[in-house]
């Protein structure tokens, strides 16, 4: 379950930012996650709740912004929507796709006090 290490990394980032920007508590965290990031959102929520106990983010809301998956098709030279890696191009059926969006996992915004 790599979601646990992701949650731990988020808490570490929050602690670093708290020291740098001098805030004491995190009330909410917004994450952008693409469908190609290989993250199970419900597992991440569970892990986030577990690792934030006793930290400056204890009780913080975890808001997930799901990004669409997109790829450039080398077969028909078009930008196309994809739901998972190794999907065929919905326009021409080619499997020669380069992912351009959807593999992100990043902290987008924080609500702090």
From Swiss-Prot:
Where Ni(2+) is bound, by residue? 2
* Record PROSITE patterns: HYPA
Q: Where does Zn(2+) bind?
A: 73, 76, 89, 92
Q: Which UniProt keywords apply?
A: Metal-binding, Nickel, Zinc
Q: Which family does it belong to?
A: Belongs to the HypA/HybF family.
What name is this protein filed under?
Hydrogenase maturation factor HypA
Q: Which domain of life is it from?
A: Bacteria
**Which terms in the Gene Ontology molecular function aspect does this entry carry?**
nickel cation binding; zinc ion binding
Q: Which InterPro entries does the record associate with it?
A: Hydgase_Ni_incorp_HypA/HybF_CS, HypA/HybF
Family matches, as NCBIfam families: hypA (TIGR00100), PRK12380.1 (NF009046)
Q: Give any single GO term for biological process.
A: protein modification process
What this chain does, per the entry, is described as:
Involved in the maturation of [NiFe] hydrogenases. Required for nickel insertion into the metal center of the hydrogenase.
């Amino acid at each position: 379950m790599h979601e646990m290490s992701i949650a731990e990394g988020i808490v570490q980032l929050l602690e670093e930012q708290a020291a740098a920007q001098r805030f004491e508590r995190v009330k909410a965290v917004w994450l952008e996650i693409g469908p190609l990031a290989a993250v199970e959102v419900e597992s991440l929520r569970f892990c986030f709740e577990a690792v934030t106990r006793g930290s400056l983010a204890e009780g913080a809301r975890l808001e997930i912004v799901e990004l669409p998956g997109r790829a450039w098709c080398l077969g028909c030279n078009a930008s196309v929507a994809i739901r998972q890696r190794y999907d065929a191009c919905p326009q021409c059926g080619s499997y020669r796709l380069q992912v351009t969006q959807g593999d992100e996992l990043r902290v987008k915004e924080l609500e702090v006090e």
